[in-house]
Structure formats: structure tokens, C-alpha cells
Amino acid sequence: MMQKKLLLIVSIILNLVFTIHILYYSSTTWNPTWTNRAAAEAETVASFSCSGHGRAFVDGLGVLDGQKPPCECNNCYIGKDCSVLLKDCPVDANSGDPLFLEPFWMRQAERSAILVSGWHRMSYIYEDGTYVSRELEKVIRKLHSVVGNAVTDNRFVIFGSGTTQLLAAAVHALSLTNSSVSSPARLLTSIPYYAMYKDQAEFFDSAHLKFEGNASAWKQSGRNDNITQVIEVVTSPNNPDGKLKRAVLDGPNVKTLHDYAYYWPHFSPITHPVDEDLSLFSLSKTTGHAGSRFGWGLVKDKAIYEKMDRFIRLTSMGVSKETQLHVLQLLKVVVGDGGNEIFSFGYGTVKKRWETLNKIFSMSTRFSLQTIKPEYCNYFKKVREFTPSYAWVKCERPEDTNCYEIFRAAKITGRNGNVFGSEERFVRLSLIRSQDDFDQLIAMLKKLVYHEEDVPSENFMYI
């Protein structure tokens, strides 16, 4: 009898030990199964240095044939490892690729990484029947709250494939707000303006919309009759000159669309939280991820929101679920410390570039840069300079009528002022590309300014 009791007790104890061991092992140790290959592949490709002048990517050429992805070199660098710099290579200062933030994200490799399963959200819609990730909507509202650049209360949040799609959706929605008017709505903006506004209006060639151009000229003309439906696009900070803008037009016939793609601490003092009826923002100028093609809008009026939403559904059936997951992870990193790391890095980087640029142009009598008075920034809690994405350069000599061609002859490709509705005496130079691009731009600018008649060569020694 005692022997049976002992055996029973031993059996119970062993079962308890095994149960505790299994529970403890399961809760404290986890071994990945299906993620091993993908993680190893990503880590391997990320380890390719490409001499610091390029990047390798998991979707690079040759991977389908079992080859290692090649280094994709920065502009003016060549070779298998991007180690060879081409002499007198033309500089690309045209594109607004925000690669200046790439070093920040490389430092955040672990926090920003995601691994997507092959069956991730295969449905068209989320559980609530929409095309919108509610978690992403929440983190976007939090982002604006911590930065203090926009009011999100009592606003609908709409997603699009970049602000390019949202711009088309917004203009479409606003042009349909008064169907009783037979003539098309006029699309207006301030000069210099972002060319996409004109390009989209003319490309879609809608019976409901006509690009008219300069808002100030319209206001002073006899056509400003308070009857013709008008849509004014206000870009603030402005592209190309970086200045804060306000609406020029008002009246019962005027609808205003605000493009705040550049209203982030990288580029501008955050002077106040904007509180508009319709505002657009872009991931590309927030985190630098232009290739993700993601933007969002804050819309006060439900009817306008519904028209925009219908436009998005009919043209793309929402934004990719993988994109929304990626953006969610990126913005979680941003808001995790109130944006301090990324905005301090971004502002510091662009500020240094402007300091270098100003030193060069201060020696020139042939070229001048835009000037913007410093303002108090509520985000950084100090008065600070504007640090725009672009240099808006003016050729001052009477004979220099085409500034773009003058810079192109100096092997600097900018963007012609006439693209922005302005004079050809202006050219836009991008300051937000990679450090390699900026270094090459500075080298070419030194040569250009150096050849001015009245600039002593010793002035360049400390730039």
C-alpha cells in the first residue's frame, strides 16, 4: 500500500516538473521557424557596405538567378563596390529625393524593421470593411500632436498613394461642390508654385476644372466676381522657395486646399498647429520614404471627405496593406521619443548644408539665394532659421536670362524657374539628396563662383 502511494506521489511530482519545465521553456525561449531565411537574407544584404557610396537591396538585379544583389551606386560613383568617383561628373540637383534621412534609418535598423508573412492581409479590406489601418490613423494623429503642426480633432483622415494622388482627389472633390455652376472651377496658386498642380489639371483635362495660375493676378482682375468657383492651393512652406504662405483669396466662391508636405521641423519653424478645412501631408518629407508612396489628408467636411474617398477607391482601391504596415512601424519609431531623434537629425543635417551654401553664395555677386526671416519654433522651443529643402537661386546679371542653362553649363542640373510659373532667371537646387550628392554640388558651386571676376581664391580655403 505504501509503495503504491510513493509511486503515485513520484508520478505527480514528475508530471509537475515536466509541466513547469514546458511552460517555463515556452515562455522564456522562442526559436524562429519560417522567418530565419528572410531575416538572414535581409541582414546579409544590409551588410554590403558598397564603400559607403551606394546600397544593395534584397530585390536587386540578379537575385532571381541566385546571384548576390549588386551595389546600386550613388550619382557619380561606379564600380562593383561603388568605390570609383567619376571626375567632373554632372551633379543632380533636380530631384527632391529626401535621401538625407537615410543615415538616420540605418541607425534605427532594428526598431524600424518589419518582416511580412506571405499571407499578410490578403483581403482588399480591413476587418471594419475599410481600406484604412485604424492603428496607422491613430499614430498619425499622435504624430501631429507631438510635433504640434496640425489640429486633427474633428477631422477625417484619408490615405493616398502619396500626396500626388491626394491632390488629384482633393481638387476633384472641391471642383464638384457646386454643380449648379455651368463653368469649370478655376485652380489658382501663388507664384512660384509646385508644377504638379498645373500638370495634373491639364493632364486630366476635366470639364469641371481649369488651371488659371496666379492667385494674386486673379484677385486684381475683373474676373474675381465672387461667382466663379475658385480653388486656391496654398503650399506652406512653399516649394520651391520654402516660405510660409497664406491664402490670397477669400469669399463664398473660394475653396482652399493646403499642401503642408514640408511643414516639419526638418525644414521650417513650427509656428502654430494649422487648423484648416483640408490639409495634405506626405510621408516622403516626414520620414524620407519617398518610394513608399504614402500621404494623408486631414478633412473637416464630411461631404468633401466622401468625394475624396470615392476617388481613391475608384482609382486604386486604397493604399497597399504592406505600405500601411511599413508606415505604421516607421511612425511608431518617430513618435516613440516625441520625434526628437529624427527631427533633430534632419534639422541638424539640413542646417549644416545651408550654412555651407550661404558661405559660398555670400562671396558671389552673380547669384543670390532666397532669404527668410527666422521665427520662433514651438517644437524646438527657440527662434530658428528656416532650412528649406531647396535653394531658390536668382541670376542677378542682366545678361543671365536663363539661370538653369548657366548652371547646366557648370555641370549642375537644377530645375528651371519657368517650371514653377516664375522667370527663367531662377533655378531650384535640391539640398535633400544624399551626402554624396550634396558634396558634389558644393564642389561644382565652388568652381562656378570661383570663376567670378571679383572673388579671391583664398575665400574658399575654409569652406
From Swiss-Prot:
Keywords noted in UniProt: Aminotransferase, Membrane, Pyridoxal phosphate, Transferase, Transmembrane, Transmembrane helix
Entry-linked Pfam families: Alliinase_C, EGF_alliinase
Secretion signal, residue range per the UniProt entry: none
Residue positions binding pyridoxal 5'-phosphate: 124, 163-164, 239, 259-262, 282-285, 293
Principal EC category: transferase
Alphabetized InterPro entries for the sequence: Alliinase_C, Alliinase_N_sf, EGF_alliinase, Ethylene_sulfur-biosynth, PyrdxlP-dep_Trfase, PyrdxlP-dep_Trfase_major, PyrdxlP-dep_Trfase_small
Keyword flag Transmembrane: yes
Topological relation to the membrane, as annotated: Single-pass membrane protein
Transmembrane feature ranges: 6-26
UniProt-annotated location(s): Membrane
Cofactor: pyridoxal 5'-phosphate
Classification via SUPFAM superfamilies: PLP-dependent transferases (SSF53383)
EC number: 2.6.1.-
Main location: membrane
The family this protein is said to belong to: Belongs to the alliinase family.
Protein name: Tryptophan aminotransferase-related protein 4
Annotated positions of the N6-(pyridoxal phosphate)lysine modification: 285
Keyword Transferase among record annotations: yes
GO cellular component labels: membrane
Annotated function: Probable aminotransferase.
Molecular-function annotations in GO: carbon-sulfur lyase activity; transaminase activity
Coiled-coil intervals, chain numbering: none
